[in-house]
Design a protein with these regions (language model features):
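Short, Lys/Arg-rich flexible segments
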Residues: 1-76, 98-138
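Short, surface-exposed beta-strand/loop "edge" segments at domain boundaries and coil↔beta transitions
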Residues: 74-78, 83-96
Length: 138
């Protein structure tokens, strides 16, 4: 096998490993950061009196509602909260604000950007990627 073929094979294996680690180790870090941001930016904003929040049992902070995908071409991880209420994405409503059924307006409570900033500043995502790749032999 030529050096070029060896390098191409290595790069293909590395790309596959990066995608795997992003979908497992790094996405777990991202989900934890999102969960914390939901508690700090959304749940701490007010205590509802008309309804009970589902929180970690099917609510916005439930990691089971967070779907991770990887764009292989750009090596980009995206974690999206897929929780919906009456056909509307709850995260989108919370991020942008919405009108309640009683007519009251709920202000925007952005949490994605704070989660991303905190996660990147902590170095946890980078550490998870490095550790995951080492565990796969890279």
């Amino acid at each position: 096998m030529s050096i070029e073929a060896d390098v191409n094979l290595f790069m293909k294996q590395l790309d596959t490993a990066i995608s795997k680690v992003l979908l497992t180790d790094v996405s777990e870090v991202a989900k934890n950061a999102l969960r914390e941001a939901v508690y700090e930016e959304v749940y701490a904003a007010y205590t509802p009196t008309v309804y009970e929040r589902q929180m970690d049992s099917g609510g916005l902070s439930d990691k089971e509602n967070m779907m991770a995908t990887v764009d292989v071409a750009t090596r980009t991880l995206e974690v999206e909260d897929i929780r919906s209420d009456e056909g509307a994405n709850v995260a989108t409503k919370v991020e942008g604000g919405y009108r309640m059924p009683n007519g009251a307006m709920m202000g925007a409570r952005p949490f994605h950007k704070p989660a991303e900033e905190k996660m990147m500043a902590s170095g946890e995502a980078e550490s998870a990627l490095e550790s995951g790749l080492k565990n796969l032999g890279f």
